[in-house]
């Protein structure tokens, strides 16, 4: 990724070719249609609801983007949360967004910062690989899996095993866009909205 980023910065790699690489690493471009940014020029500071946080007047608005961070079944450790919080403060707007697929997202990320950000995530066992693009998206599970009184068994180990198996698997690199998988630990219940996924597994 870092090599392709350097080639892209040197105008030696087509933007469309690089886009496929960055999407597979969870790096999105962001566009603003409300006057906040146009062609890389800030016309006013971005304001956040119920907060005084902005990116600040000294930010170089060179098309900041979004970094999606893959968290299988939403399982995260205290150490990982500390690192995620630090990255939100250092590279983003101080806000760590939680997604409906149990991922995290950092907005207003500069593409030049993404290699260091990815290295720091990797140091605590987190990846952004295949968080976007034509791959299997984050494997989700019941939000209270492992502690639910009604579950048949804890499905989180199965969610993690499938995530590990599919990550980088050659047969899962050119799926249809947003191929999604979820696990439910409750027999006869569509917890984690498994009935709305491409593959939904229900414990029995």
Regions found by a protein language model. Give the residues of each.
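N-terminal glycine-rich anion-binding loops that anchor highly charged ligand groups
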Residues: 48-64
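Charge-rich, low-complexity segments
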Residues: 1-52, 191-194
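Small-residue-enriched alpha-helical segments and adjacent helix-cap loops
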Residues: 6, 30-31, 37-43, 64-204
């Amino acid at each position: 990724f870092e090599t392709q980023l350097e080639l892209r910065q040197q105008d030696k790699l087509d933007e469309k070719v690089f886009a496929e690489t960055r999407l597979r690493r969870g790096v999105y471009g962001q566009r603003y249609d409300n006057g906040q940014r146009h062609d890389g020029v800030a016309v006013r500071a971005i304001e956040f609801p119920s907060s005084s946080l902005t990116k600040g007047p000294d930010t170089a608005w060179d098309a900041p983007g979004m970094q999606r961070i893959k968290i299988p079944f939403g399982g995260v450790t205290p150490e990982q949360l500390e690192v995620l919080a630090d990255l939100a403060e250092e590279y983003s707007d101080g806000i760590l967004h939680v997604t409906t697929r149990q991922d995290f997202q950092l907005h207003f990320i500069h593409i030049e910062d993404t290699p260091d950000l990815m290295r720091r995530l990797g140091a605590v066992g987190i990846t952004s690989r295949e968080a976007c693009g034509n791959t299997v998206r984050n494997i989700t599970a019941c939000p209270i899996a492992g502690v639910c009184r009604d579950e048949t068994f804890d499905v989180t180990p199965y969610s993690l095993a499938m995530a590990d198996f599919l990550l980088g698997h050659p047969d899962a690199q050119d799926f249809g866009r947003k191929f999604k998988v979820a696990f439910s630990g409750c027999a006869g219940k569509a917890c984690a909205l498994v009935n709305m996924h491409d593959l939904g597994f229900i414990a029995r």
